Amino acid sequence: MQDVKTYLSTAPVLATLWFGFLAGLLIEINRSFSDALVLPFF
């Protein structure tokens, strides 16, 4: 039961950190390449 409590307390924290990192990465990529239609042609 302790393992389940540990999992439930760490999974949301890890998901929040991961999605925050991913959102920041996508924002920086979008800031560098503002037009997404041009990106596949490079």
UniProtKB/Swiss-Prot annotation:
Physiological role: May help in the organization of the PsaE and PsaF subunits.
Transmembrane spans: 7-27
UniProt source species: Anthoceros angustus (Hornwort)
Protein name (database record): Photosystem I reaction center subunit IX
Subcellular location: Plastid, Chloroplast thylakoid membrane
Major location (coarse): plastid
Lineage, opening ranks: Eukaryota, Viridiplantae, Streptophyta, Embryophyta, Anthocerotophyta
Record key words, sorted: Chloroplast, Membrane, Photosynthesis, Photosystem I, Plastid, Thylakoid, Transmembrane, Transmembrane helix
Gene encoding the protein: psaJ
Listed GO CC annotations: chloroplast thylakoid membrane; photosystem I
